[in-house]
């Protein structure tokens, strides 16, 4: 049953970048929300954009491109908010304290769905 599968998938937050909203307290911390938007939504924008370029069906490719545009908009909001909020050393320190863990968590979520490429593993080692 397709509807049942959709509902079951929607409940698996550990497989989605949105799980980081809770982990990093993004709903009550504007700095963390900006970080989430910039990194997670930015990653989503790149992924949807890449899929839009690879899909042969023009209808689906167009839909994916629209999703990529929306995700880019959210990432831009995050970047703008961080630029505004990170004017103090305290705010910068708060971001710097979590950013590498955030990247690793986002990478783990992506890898759980698609597998991990050796190149991605090397890139993530830079954040150790």
What are these regions (language model features)?
Residues 1-128:
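Non-heme di-metal
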């Amino acid at each position: 049953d397709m509807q049942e599968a959709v509902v079951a998938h929607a409940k698996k937050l550990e497989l989605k970048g949105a799980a980081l909203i809770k982990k990093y307290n993004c709903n009550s911390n504007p700095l963390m929300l900006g970080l989430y938007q910039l990194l997670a939504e930015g990653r989503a924008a790149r992924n949807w954009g890449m899929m839009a370029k690879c899909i042969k069906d023009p209808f689906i490719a167009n839909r994916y491109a629209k999703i990529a545009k929306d995700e880019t908009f959210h990432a831009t909001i995050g970047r703008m908010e961080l630029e505004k909020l990170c004017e103090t050393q305290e705010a910068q320190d708060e971001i710097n304290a979590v950013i590498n863990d955030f990247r690793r968590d986002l990478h783990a979520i992506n890898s759980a769905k698609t597998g991990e490429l050796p190149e991605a593993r090397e890139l993530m080692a830079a954040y150790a």
